[in-house]
């Protein structure tokens, strides 16, 4: 007796179809699972056996062979528990084979209840694209899977395998889950307000420029100057996620197993702040199942690295590929996977090991060589990929008491959204399909977009030769200047835009490189 059901697996960021075949034949009672299963899939036989008996069904006392096709692709995780149980029931004659356009996902508990699984959204998207009309998933995954619903596919939530069997038999139909309307606007309310930050006008301006153009920022200052406060408030002035960005971000969080139960799409821009002891694998991702790392979990959001020089050199060098390409490739013996990693880097560091080099009132206890060694932990190639560098001085007493209120996140957001609207109109032209903001311009696009006045061009030439800028630094200065001009509503880059952009860049090269 033979039966086949449809399910799905994960390969990197995308799902792929899997046929779960069950064959029951004569011979000694045994269960064999083939088709490159990992240990979690091999263990599913015991879960299915116990769940099937606890649900009141009969376990066939014959030889059972399960094949997961295609057989040349590794199958991972407990997602095949539910289709495996249904395949055994169908092959043993206890259940009519489900329609070919029906698919199943879910982990089984020993009592037959269904537990949520990771990666449901990419698998559901593949199911919808592959012509599946009915997708049965654990109830906790239903809201997420429903985001893949089109005009054809319906998502059916189930708390137990018995509910799925009864629905297939027509005894007790399951109502489909409908997708929740996408509304990212309320995500801003979850982020602290810039009005809480006292003083630091230069750093606040840098954060507005960063948000308006998607630029990377380095904040340098003594402890207590507000570096972390500024970084944590950046998502509150960024534009809302588009639905496309929300789907991509949700896929990453779903694969990583970090989606809350019952949640649909991620609506807030991610903010990730790994500890400085994080390894290169924690940042890049990896493991036996190619889990996304912090670089990918920060996709479409902010990656905040506090105490930047305290990270290992190996961990910091991992950042170079995603900062340049917007993606990161994880390679292991079992294969490789590429994840999107288009994040904004906000890094913070003290000026020296003790934190008080150059402080107006506190004495620094570090020797010049110790200061040099501390700062040299951040490599030149990484610094070259950071657009804005700001030195932050201690906040004065008068700025804490009696000063005029700082601009709120809502006020700063208006400036950012106005500049982003200019960029959206500019990059709607053919040839800019992959560009959403100024920071994503390629070298060739920079030449076409960043037109300057003659005086600004002369200034850039002199700065290029005097500061010894690299070609990459030259392009990044122009991108920042383009953002500053957009914030001011200027069509051409003038001297003011270029001088402000150079101010951030020159400070980085002169003060941090020895």
Question: What kind of feature is each model-predicted range?
Answer:
Residues 245-279, 286-287, 434-444, 471, ...:
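Conserved inter-motif catalytic segment of the P-loop NTP-binding fold
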Residues 40-45, 60, 67-77, 290, ...:
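Basic, amphipathic alpha-helical bundle interface domains used for macromolecular binding and assembly
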Residues 208, 265, 270, 280-303, ...:
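Conserved alpha-helical scaffold flanking the Walker A/P-loop in AAA+ ATPase domains
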Residues 105, 158, 284, 304-308:
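Hydrophobic residues in beta-strands of the RecA-like P-loop NTPase core, especially within AAA+ ATPase
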Residues 1-218, 222, 228, 331, ...:
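Peripheral, non-AAA+ core regions of ATP-driven protein-machinery
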Residues 300, 306-307, 318:
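Walker B catalytic acidic pair
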Residues 219-260:
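Walker A/P-loop
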